[in-house]
Amino acid sequence: MNNDVISPEFDENGRPLRRIRSFVRRQGRLTKGQQHALDHYWPVMGVEYRAEPLDLVALFGRDAPVTLEIGFGMGSSLVEMAKTNPQQNFLGIEVHSPGVGACLSAAHEEGVENLRVMCHDAVEVLEKMIPDGSLHMVQLFFPDPWHKARHNKRRIVQVPFAQLVLRKLQPGGVFHMATDWEPYAEHMLEVMSSVEGYENLSPTQDYVPRPASRPVTKFEQRGHRLGHGVWDLMFGRVK
């Protein structure tokens, strides 16, 4: 597995370009199980970054709806969704290799075959590898909220990102977001409502109840016990 999660970019004079990232690379130590999974299961389920469009039918060996999840953490929810929906294809992106290893291990243990994973910057993957109009759904669950005002620009949900996702969705495809930080939920709602080509799938034009398709994470369960809220947003690409 290539450990370069960001491709270097340069201006016309050869100077490195600085791009605002929505994540900080925190490489924790791999457990033996995670390393074993990367060594043995990555060749089957892993996808290396290349700056060229993916053939999604060839990647999965069939033509089926593709759900892309950005930042799957340790992968338990993603594996559960893939197992529950064998008629769909799932592609997960995560920049932290321990999470990728944990996801691969869980997928192997559950016998999941309709899942592929990447370890790279999701924005670059969307820009370079995902064909326009190819995705059934894009999922972004509990991204870093970047609480401090001076860091708000690092939030992944911004107008250019929403427009990028829109291009990659099929007509009628859905961008599903969830956050447990209300100011970020409000920010998401404001951004998404401003981008032409989306429709808010909430009857009240704000948030939706958690759909059954999104498993409740352990982190979320703990938050519920502490009285914390969670906000789900679903925006569809206008047909």
Swiss-Prot record:
Assigned EC number: 2.1.1.33
Gene3D superfamilies according to UniProt: Vaccinia Virus protein VP39 (3.40.50.150)
Keyword annotations: Methyltransferase, S-adenosyl-L-methionine, Transferase, tRNA processing
SS bond partners: none
Pfam family, one: Methyltransf_4
Pathway info: tRNA modification; N(7)-methylguanine-tRNA biosynthesis
Catalytic reactions of this protein: guanosine(46) in tRNA + S-adenosyl-L-methionine = N(7)-methylguanosine(46) in tRNA + S-adenosyl-L-homocysteine
Recorded GO MF terms: tRNA (guanine(46)-N7)-methyltransferase activity
Keyword Protease assigned: no
The protein's assembly and partners: Monomer.
Protein name (database record): tRNA (guanine-N(7)-)-methyltransferase
Native source organism of the sequence: Cronobacter sakazakii (strain ATCC BAA-894)
